[in-house]
């Protein structure tokens, strides 16, 4: 009997070690896949393959990080049991339905001959949905560690942006020619750097880092947003800072003491913010604000609505290929890019499919936000408000995936476990 007990114990210990090794492997592969998608810009990828240029096979038009995420997904979802409780089941179902809807959308685009359009939705939204499913397959500790890694990535990007703004030398390749130098950090565009830094402030405050580390991270991200030249993103970041201060609970203080403490901190933030603006302006890092917020570049986002005079009703109902849309924007409207996510999604998908897609995206985001901390909610709202001012939602970017991964990383999982599952 003793020998059998020892054998059983050895087998159980060996099985436990095997499960731990598999969990660690999936965790590391997940981080590697996410970082591939989140840090390799289109300009870098173009050095190795024809990712954004004309011609080439469709397989070349998908990001290497997207392939990595799609390869990790079966391993994370099938290789071991997934333990979901309470409201987590509803979140998993919501993400799965969103992914299936996108697969159906890809089939639709292929049937109507708009295969070039599908690359945008695969790289931006399908990869984000699959990344969300991978996150749901992780343990609570693994999710939070992944979130910490992504926040550190945003901090590195912000610090790179500050270095680039000071030295006027970009670390990564950037092919666009601009009248004024703007840093990009680890992103593909200065506006993307500003958007992610702005949203990252709230996500940094949602971590479990020491208070001083969270405040330092928020400060670095705010400076990164400021030097990026993304004016609207900086305005949303400023509003976000006040929202985080006023709307997030301070559980270790009574309500009365919390109000008093917030009033003192608010005064300090106003003084510190004024000093920061003066310092950055004196260093010439806020030159983009010299012409105000609504200059010629900002008016491009208004003049893009003239596109309705250059397309037919068939385009409005059934959409148009991505290359045809670019041709209209550049040759008819004489604009370099289409920096309007609503117009881009409408013209790429057509009105019925665009309404279906936007509704599904909004519903999915609201569903995964359930039981998220106030700082996480504020961060996601900041992200979408800032992203709507540029093309982060309508081109092949990792921004949506980054936001979704961070929301799932910093959700209140204990509350989700105890809550009953709801339909949807």
Regions found by a protein language model. Give the residues of each.
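Hydrophobic, aromatic-rich transmembrane alpha-helices
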Residues: 24-27, 69-86, 198-207, 351-370
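Alpha-helical transmembrane segments of multi-pass inner-membrane proteins
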Residues: 147-171, 188-248
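Aromatic-anchored transmembrane helix interface
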Residues: 94-106, 113-137
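N-terminal signal-anchor transmembrane segment
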Residues: 2-81, 383-387
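Hydrophobic transmembrane alpha-helices and their immediate junctions
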Residues: 84-89, 96, 264-265, 348-387, ...
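Flexible juxtamembrane loops connecting transmembrane helices in multi-pass membrane enzymes
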Residues: 179-186, 252-263, 271-305, 327-332
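Long extracytoplasmic/lumenal interhelical loops at the membrane interface
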Residues: 47-54, 171, 287-349
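Transmembrane alpha-helices of multi-pass inner-membrane enzymes
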Residues: 377-386, 392-424
